[in-house]
Design a protein with these regions (language model features):
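Short, small-residue-biased leader/transition segments that mark boundaries at the very start
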Residues: 1-8
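Helix-to-loop junctions at the C-terminal end of transmembrane segments
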Residues: 9-20
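C-terminal ends and interior cores of transmembrane alpha-helices
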Residues: 30-44
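Hydrophobic core of transmembrane alpha-helices in multi-pass small-molecule transporters
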Residues: 47-66, 70
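Loop-to-transmembrane helix entry/capping segments in MFS-fold secondary transporters
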Residues: 78-94
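A gly/Pro-rich, aromatic-decorated transmembrane alpha-helix motif that marks the paired
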Residues: 100-116
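A membrane-interface helix-boundary motif in multi-pass transporters
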Residues: 111-142
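Intrinsic disorder in cytosolic terminal tails and internal cytosolic loops
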Residues: 155-175
Length: 175
């Protein structure tokens, strides 16, 4: 637990140095690589499997904490572009989108389990357990890739743009 705390304490410094978008993108790429390696190796030792997932989800933890700071950057960018600060509206849209994503992923999980033939009667069949393993590696890897690509190609707030927005708002508010 202390080790994880130390990792996350460094996150703020890394985000300041490289940028939030950049750090979030890299954390998703590293998580993808870890998931793919786990899928390819198919570890038979449960602790090796757990190790891969702990490492991948430390990366997810980076993203999940950075995203909250990125919301503030979006609010600042909106204020620079529109001249009004819309904290509540932007946060509400983000919160709603997050809830939609969580609902979708919950439904997807059930659908994937059905697709591999999971039921109470087949829970320990080798084909089903291998299917669960495959889903547990492939589904997160696909999600991490989708997030990394979205951040890289769609999310416009690079470190430089965020710094420009901060300067513009400082100048605007000091008048």
């Amino acid at each position: 637990s202390r080790g994880f705390g130390d990792v996350y304490k460094r996150q703020s410094k890394l985000a300041s140095r490289f940028g939030k978008k950049e750090l979030a993108t890299v954390s998703c790429i590293v998580a993808t690589v870890l998931e793919v390696i786990c899928f390819v190796l198919k570890p038979t030792n449960v602790w090796v499997y757990v190790g891969f997932f702990c490492a991948a989800f430390i990366c997810l933890g980076f993203f999940n904490t950075i995203i909250w700071a990125m919301i503030t950057d979006v609010i600042d960018d909106s204020e620079v572009r529109n001249g009004i600060r819309e904290d509540g509206t932007i946060y509400a849209v983000y919160s709603f989108a997050r809830k939609l994503g969580q609902a979708f992923s919950s439904g997807l999980t059930g659908g994937l389990l059905t697709m591999i033939g999971y039921s109470a009667a087949t829970a320990f069949d080798p084909e089903v357990t291998m299917g669960i393993f495959n889903i547990s590696c492939i589904a997160p890897a696909i999600g991490f890739v989708a997030v990394a690509l979205s951040l890289f190609f769609i999310y416009p707030l690079t470190k430089q743009k965020v710094e420009e927005n901060v300067a513009a708002l400082a100048q605007r508010h000091n008048k």
